[in-house]
Structures are given as C-alpha cells and as structure tokens.
Regions:
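Gly/Ser/Thr-rich helix-start
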Residues: 98-99, 155
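Extended, intrinsically disordered, low-complexity segments
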Residues: 74, 135-174
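Residues in flexible loops and secondary-structure boundaries
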Residues: 54, 107, 124-126, 130, ...
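C-terminal helical cap(s) of enzyme catalytic domains, especially alpha/beta-barrels
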Residues: 55-70, 123-146
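Alpha-helical scaffold segments in soluble metabolic enzymes
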Residues: 9, 35, 83, 128, ...
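Alpha/beta enzyme core
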Residues: 1-94, 100-118, 162-170
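Small/polar loops that bind or transfer phosphate-bearing groups
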Residues: 96-97, 125
Length: 174
C-alpha cells in the first residue's frame, strides 16, 4: 500500500513523531487508522479539509469556496474521534475540522482526542483566541472538579458510553 510505504520511508528519515492527517472520505476509518499506526504512524489527525470550489454566477467562473471550517463540521470529527479512540486503545488522535471555541475543544477531549487543531479559529480571530480558550478550559475544569485533562479525556468515547449506537447512527431513520 502506498500510504504504508510512505510512512515507513518518512519514519526512516526523521526522528520526530509522524501523524497522518486522514480524510473522512475513506471507507473504514477505524481500520485505516489501525493500519496506519501499526505500520509506523505515531498517530492520526481527524480530519483533513478538502479544497471546496464554488461558482461565481455573475462572472461565470469557478472560484475558491469557503476555506475555513465551521461549527457544523465538528460533528464528524467528534463522531470518529470517539469511535476510533474507543475501538483502538492507545491510539493518538488529534481532532481537527470544526473546532472553533473552548467548548469544542472540551468535546474533542471527552471524545478521546490527545490534541486539538483549531486553525480556522486562529485565522479568523487571531492567535489571542488560544489564551482565551485555555482560560475557559481551566475555568470549566475547576467547576467540574477536574485537575488534569486525563481525568476526562475519552470519558465519552465509543467504549465508555452505555449506548454506542449514538455514534454509529448517521441517518434519521433506521
């Protein structure tokens, strides 16, 4: 497999951790994540955001669509972070796409993320959003009586909830 050979070559060349940023369009996300990590990836990033074209109807041109994620993009990130972290114990996951505020960060941690990327929020609001997010997380942790992230990381992942079907179901009708 091309990805496995690339991971192995990169790992032979560098001495830093190698995380693979995955697309949410792969057929079996947990299986692909497992394959990547057993073949050398130090973890995965969920998810890569695709270039999204748009059509300018006034100038009759293809143009760049919205390059930034939004809150509605977070649902897939939470779902798959929770499923993968629950099905593959010990996997390192960075949640990405749709993370815009401190509550989104906490949700990703509860789903099982080890790290969170919030690039669109930083581009939109500036780097100062990071300190604001950290302050709000600390306040929430204090109110919830948590002293460390490890106390709640993964608490609501696939393996730790009474009804895992909440993550499996993706259609309105069964």
């Amino acid at each position: 497999d091309l990805y496995v050979s690339i991971i192995r070559k990169v790992k032979e060349t560098v001495s830093i951790p190698v995380m693979i940023k995955m697309s949410k369009m792969v057929g079996n996300i947990p299986a692909v994540a497992h394959t990547l990590t057993v073949n050398g990836a130090d973890g995965i990033v969920l998810f890569n955001r695709f270039y999204q074209p748009d059509i300018d109807i006034n100038n009759m041109q293809i143009v760049s669509g919205n390059v930034f994620s939004n809150h509605s993009d977070l649902s897939d990130t939470l779902r798959w972070t929770a499923i993968v972290s629950g099905k593959i114990p010990g996997i390192s996951i960075a949640s990405s796409t749709g993370v815009h505020d401190w509550e989104d960060v906490i949700k990703c941690l509860l789903a099982g993320a080890d790290a969170i990327q919030m690039c669109s929020a930083v581009y939109t609001h500036g780097a100062e959003i990071i300190s604001q997010v950290l302050t709000c997380i600390e306040e929430w942790m204090h109110q919830a009586h948590y002293q460390s992230l490890d106390q709640f990381k993964g608490k609501l992942n696939y393996a730790n909830i009474s009804n895992p079907a909440m993550y499996e179901r993706s259609q309105f009708m069964k």
